[in-house]
Amino acid sequence: MTQPDFTRVPAVEGYTGAQSYRAGDVVTVRCASRAPLFDARITRVGAERIEVHTVEGVRGHDQPVPDRAWEAGCGWEDTFAFTVGNDWPSGFYEIELRARGEAEADWRGAGHAFFTVLGRRPDPERPLLLLSTNTYQAYNQWGGRCMYTGATEVSFDRPLERGYLRRPAAPFDTEYDGRLADTTGNDRDHDRLVEYQRHHSYPLWTSSSGWHNWERRFVRWAEAAGFGIDVATNDDLHDGPDVLAGRRLVLSVGHDEYWSWDMRDHIDRFVDDGGRW
């Protein structure tokens, strides 16, 4: 008997053409849809969830998953696009892709993608949070493998597996939305984690990495406490030191395991020049 693949969403899945954008940029979204129509809802996630845009009635079409997609990527065509608003603040943005007619509570009917918005100009009073997007992909088993199940190289050109970006509170414990990462038997929350994952059929590695586990909690706390936070990705740091220009403080929160040499060089230079990391 073939076991279901709980890393995937049956109705609609997708990912963006890039991980970060600025005001006025066009965000492209590449989807595989088994539903004839779906809607996209774009929400900034911080202390509050604020919906900023919707794209309704997107015509769905399926796109093939290549062999070794975890390594080679999907290579999907763009399905729809939208423009980042001039008034959208820096932050993490979730894209919900929900098939028409699917109930809100049914995970099979909606996939999720993400992107970040970079600020127009750096504000030295606002810390810059670098999302650990390299680590997201290292643990992302979508397409068959991750770095912990046999892959030696992984692609960013694919969706994130179900549960990385958004997970509901468990109905048996409304105050619990998933343990951070410790899955040892000695951890007092381990049993709750196992029950939570079993109840929602979440893949194992969603407890080890991902926005939902780590940065989401920090941003929610920081913004609620009155701290302004700008957001960027590992890619932004890898591409050059410009993302650090004008900053006093750069933050890494949670499970930030995978770095490139360029990332480290840029941070070292930032610290040598008086920045705080």
Write out the residue ranges for each language-model feature.
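Helical hinge/lid and interdomain linker segments adjacent to catalytic or ligand-binding clefts
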Residues: 60, 64-74, 79-83, 87-89, ...
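Extracytoplasmic entry segments of secretory-pathway proteins
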Residues: 1, 72, 127-128
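Ligand-binding face of N-terminal immunoglobulin V-set domains in extracellular IgSF glycoproteins
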Residues: 13-48, 53-102, 107-117
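Flexible loop residues that form catalytic
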Residues: 98, 132, 255
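Aromatic-Pro/Gly-enriched surface loop or interdomain linker
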Residues: 33-49, 53-58, 107-243
